[in-house]
Amino acid sequence: MTNLTRRQARRFLLLHHGLIGAYRFRGKQGAYDFVRQAGCIQFDPVDVCGKNAELTLQSRVQGFTKQTLWQLLYRDRLLVDYPDKNLSILPTEDWPYFERYRRSAREGGRQFEGLAEMEERTRQYLRENGPVNSDTLPVEGQMYWHSMIHWSGQWHGQTGAARSVLEQMYSTGELVIHHKEGARKY
């Protein structure tokens, strides 16, 4: 067993996470490698001086740009947006490890009245029209719904039906996020 002082442990962690020393991660491959090493990075839509995922990568990856992350997510599909308690960005290769979450979402979705019918209408609409967001999906009204795997929906009230059905289908893995415009998911 190796014993480390607190100072050595701090230095190791800072080096491991690419926060001190020469850049270990470079360009698009470096951004992907960092997410693989970290396991996931949290997506946070708040953008005061940059979104959390972008700031996380910018501080560790030489040459990182917002376009780099967009390409990894929505063109190359090496990363995917998926809930890991909160919406996170994770390597696509880790998708199988989240089947337990998807199964929980499928099972939990059965309790929400009208959801199955809305999912079927949504599937048909998507086949005919391609990616949509909750404003462009023609599903009206409110419903009782909340995610079984992350903080989305209302536990004690109603939420928009279009948003609910799309979030449910993302949670079950039936849909993945095609792209985002700002924080809007398509």
Language-model regions: role of each:
Residues 1-186:
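Long, low-complexity intrinsically disordered regions
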